[in-house]
């Protein structure tokens, strides 16, 4: 191939952007690759802050965000806009990340245009199509479409092998560990609200926003957190509340007015990573944070019934707390009361990456198109 390889990276939400940004920067280093960025802006405000943080500009901005749009509307808008962009650019490969609606629609648009797809963060599974919804089905379907599968861990690769997916599978580590090399430098916060937090206290960083937790599960979680705050007045819970009206109204109802719970605006990637780095522990239903916090040596309680990231549970850095009020409270109280239990989780090995996932993915693309040496797989330290 005499011309440069046209690699189009497609993403639309903040978590995707955090994990794709270091890959875009890596692709730009290779003279054999022409890197093109296409954003759908499924999360407009949150996405822009990440792009600014990494100094990345979009070549194409589909700007699909509309008030109150459902999954069908997002999917059809991405498909229609992507058709035009793909016809104009004619990339050699389209890279999508993870399991969002943008991921699925972007991969499907590339498939319809007969363009190969590379799936970053491939092979994560719960094997329950309804949990997480719609992410589990999205990533499974993208697994059928993709030609190159970039699995963060050996376990993810085994899932793909069992499913007999077509194409080549590479164990790369997770790109979020690469991203943290950019974000965790220094301790200064952008957010004024974070500058007011007293980090001499035991700070608990918290997030809760997943669609499958809407309703009673979220009320259970917030009830446990409220009780924890009231019973441990020396601890401070910092909760950047998602922009979703469902999440905001429930958080304000159940967590508002408690002196040691700070409900703050959503954070950019830099502030979120630095908040976790200075916190005592983390409570979250986020997928990415299950990978990020262990890299910082922080125990994580996962506020979900199941996780597609079992490696950290096995390693001991993460515990599945579920959405039962009593169980969440018990596990959080144990970490606040029992130094030995805390140390066991804080000192466990991070199984998700060594900060070299992006170079491995770039090398895999060069290997596929130019016959270069394939990358060595990521193997966690023991």
Where are these regions (language model features)?
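Nucleotide-activated sugar donor-binding and catalytic core shared by glycosyltransferases
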Residues: 1-239, 244-382
């Amino acid at each position: 191939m005499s011309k440069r390889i046209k690699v189009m990276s497609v993403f639309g939400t903040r978590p995707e952007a955090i994990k794709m940004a270091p890959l875009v920067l890596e692709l730009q280093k290779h003279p054999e690759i022409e890197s093109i960025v296409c954003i759908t802006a499924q999360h407009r405000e949150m996405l822009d802050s990440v792009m600014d943080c990494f100094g990345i500009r979009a070549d194409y901005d589909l700007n699909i965000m509309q008030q109150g749009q459902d999954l069908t509307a997002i999917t059809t808008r991405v498909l229609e806009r992507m058709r035009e962009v793909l016809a104009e650019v004619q990339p050699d490969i389209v890279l999508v990340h993870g399991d969002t609606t943008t991921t699925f629609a972007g991969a499907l648009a590339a498939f319809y245009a007969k363009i190969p797809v590379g799936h970053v963060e491939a092979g994560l599974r719960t094997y329950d199509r309804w949990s997480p919804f719609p992410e589990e089905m999205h990533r499974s379907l993208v697994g059928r479409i993709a030609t190159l599968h970039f699995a963060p861990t050996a376990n993810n690769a085994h899932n793909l092998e069992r499913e007999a997916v077509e194409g080549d599978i590479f164990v790369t580590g997770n790109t979020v560990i690469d991203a943290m090399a950019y974000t965790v430098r220094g301790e200064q916060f952008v957010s004024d609200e974070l500058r007011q937090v007293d980090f001499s206290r035991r700070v608990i960083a918290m997030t809760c926003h997943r669609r499958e937790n809407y309703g009673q599960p979220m009320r259970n979680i917030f009830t446990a957190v409220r009780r924890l705050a009231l019973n441990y007045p020396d601890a401070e819970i910092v909760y950047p509340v998602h922009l979703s009206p469902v999440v905001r109204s429930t958080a304000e109802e159940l967590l508002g007015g408690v002196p040691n719970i700070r409900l703050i605006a959503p954070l950019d990637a830099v502030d979120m990573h630095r908040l976790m780095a200075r916190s005592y522990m983390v409570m979250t239903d986020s997928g990415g944070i299950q990978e990020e916090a262990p890299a910082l040596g922080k125990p994580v309680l996962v506020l979900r019934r199941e996780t597609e990231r079992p490696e950290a549970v096995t390693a001991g850095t993460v515990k599945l707390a579920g959405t039962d009020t009593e169980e969440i409270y018990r596990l959080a109280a144990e970490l606040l009361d029992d130094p030995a239990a805390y140390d066991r989780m804080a000192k466990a090995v991070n199984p998700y990456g060594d900060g070299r996932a992006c170079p491995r993915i770039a090398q895999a693309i060069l290997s596929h198109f130019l016959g270069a040496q394939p990358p060595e797989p990521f193997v966690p330290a023991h």
